[in-house]
Structure formats: structure tokens, C-alpha cells
């Protein structure tokens, strides 16, 4: 259910794009992300840092898209967000000694420290690659193809990455 909740702004962006175009879709994505943050704050009293970062990036890049009437800003948004996540994972680990992946998943999994480090780096590399891939699609495909990639391509890539990660992690999990 959380996965669908996380996709909420992207799904609404996709639907609005198909019905009304990129600029309305951008406004819908901003509103949906604001609503998402408000809902999380209301329900849980605490909003994850990643969601705050997502809100900030969509407001800045979506706002620039609407004010300047230039769709390139909203198209760059995923790359900026993915690269911020990648840098955040690496910086938190090596500058501040905190493994954010372990912090997010540590209650569900018991893994040796070197495995947590590999997992953290794998996610950082994955986010960096998603950012590069987004730029490639923006530069080489139509706006409509980019929107399809944004929903289906990145979501599919994340699902495949999580499955591969789960298969890799299986050898480290202790039977209880």
C-alpha cells in the first residue's frame, strides 16, 4: 500500500498529462505532493526527509516549469532528485558515519555491517544511473515518451532492482 501511496503524485501527473498536457500535469504533481506531505504529517506527525526533499524539488522545478512555461525543468526534476538521493546516501555514510539504508531497513533485516555498506552503495549507484537514464530519455525522446518512461520505466526499474536486491540479500539472512 505504501508503494502505491508513494506513486500517487506520479500517477496523477501521468493522468493529467494525458488529459491536459505538461503544464497542468506539473501543477497537479505539485498539489498532489503537497497533499501527500500534509496527509503524512497529519497521520504520523513526522514526515520522512526523503518526502520533504521530494516536495522541495517538485516545488522548485515544477514552479520553474510553470512560471517560465518551459517543460525542461519538470523533466530535469527526477534527475536532480535521484542525484540528491545518491549523494545523500554516500555523504551520510562517509561524511557522517550513518548508513541511511540500514536506518530505513534495519528493523526488518539483520545484516553484517559490510553488507549494509554494499547495499547503501548499490542504492546510490542505482539512483545515479536512474538520473543519467532520465536525462538520456529527456534528450532523445518525445515529451510523451518521457512521461511514459517516468511512470512505467522508472517504476519497473525500481521493482527489478528490489527483486535483484532481495535475491542477493537472501544469502545473508539468518533463518529464525
UniProtKB/Swiss-Prot annotation:
The chain crosses the membrane at residues 3-23, 49-69, 72-92, 118-138, 149-169. InterPro entries: YciB. GO terms for cellular component: plasma membrane. It is found in: Cell inner membrane. Keywords: Cell inner membrane, Cell membrane, Membrane, Transmembrane, Transmembrane helix. It is a multi-pass membrane protein. Belongs to the YciB family. This is Inner membrane-spanning protein YciB. It comes from Burkholderia mallei (strain ATCC 23344).
